[in-house]
């Protein structure tokens, strides 16, 4: 019993410290220093309603919108609870079939020429909110037709929403699809 008392006391102390005090302090610091990020990097529409996060991809399938990367999450697309890649290699027959079906769907939607890989391959998490500028540009004719807009106006919108490499050398230029589509709705509903 003598050895049990200090063990129980330490359990209680560390439970309070690690389960209560530490998370409260870290959350407080995050709220003070990075308030937007601490709340999930939420995006609001023109009416101020929260419509998504800059960190998680959203499904868009209509011809009036730019389409995101395919989702790799099971059951239904863009499910954060099921985040994770398929782990299928580039020679996997099921993977090749899926990519082939995606290419056919893009061709059927009117995309001509070279198709950027990020329009047919899911990201490692399956929830990537970004596409490359090239992936947005190949969609311009479809979106322009569906919205009755000029290709030039869409090109300018894409350029305005292209994020550069982080610190000038990390990653590739990218476009957040949700932010681009919200701007598109604001410009021409």
From Swiss-Prot:
Coiled coil: none annotated. Keywords: ATP-binding, Cell inner membrane, Cell membrane, Ion transport, Membrane, Nucleotide-binding, Potassium, Potassium transport, Transmembrane, Transmembrane helix, Transport. The chain crosses the membrane at residues 6-26. It is a single-pass membrane protein. GO terms for molecular function: ATP binding; P-type potassium transmembrane transporter activity. One of its GO terms (biological process) is potassium ion transmembrane transport. GO terms for cellular component: plasma membrane. It is found in: Cell inner membrane. Its main location: membrane. The system is composed of three essential subunits: KdpA, KdpB and KdpC. Belongs to the KdpC family. HAMAP family: KdpC. Part of the high-affinity ATP-driven potassium transport (or Kdp) system, which catalyzes the hydrolysis of ATP coupled with the electrogenic transport of potassium into the cytoplasm. This subunit acts as a catalytic chaperone that increases the ATP-binding affinity of the ATP-hydrolyzing subunit KdpB by the formation of a transient KdpB/KdpC/ATP ternary complex. This is Potassium-transporting ATPase KdpC subunit. It comes from Geobacter sulfurreducens (strain ATCC 51573 / DSM 12127 / PCA).
């Amino acid at each position: 019993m003598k050895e049990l008392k200090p063990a129980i006391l330490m359990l209680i102390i560390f439970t309070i410290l690690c389960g209560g005090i530490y998370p409260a302090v870290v959350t407080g610091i995050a709220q003070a220093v990075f308030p937007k990020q601490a709340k999930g990097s939420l995006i609001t529409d023109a009416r101020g309603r929260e419509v998504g996060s800059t960190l998680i991809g959203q499904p868009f399938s209509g011809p009036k919108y730019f389409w995101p990367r395919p989702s790799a999450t099971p059951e239904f697309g863009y499910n954060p609870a099921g985040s994770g890649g398929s782990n299928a290699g580039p020679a996997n027959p099921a993977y090749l079939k899926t990519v082939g079906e995606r290419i056919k769907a893009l061709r059927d939607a009117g995309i001509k020429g070279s198709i950027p890989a990020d329009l047919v391959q899911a990201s490692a998490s399956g929830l990537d909110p970004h596409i490359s500028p090239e992936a947005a540009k190949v969609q311009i004719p479809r979106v322009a037709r569906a919205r009755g807009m000029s290709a030039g106006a869409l090109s300018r919108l894409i350029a305005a929403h292209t994020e550069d490499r982080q610190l000038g050398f990390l990653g590739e230029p990218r476009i957040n699809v949700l932010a681009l589509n919200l701007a598109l709705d604001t410009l021409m509903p």
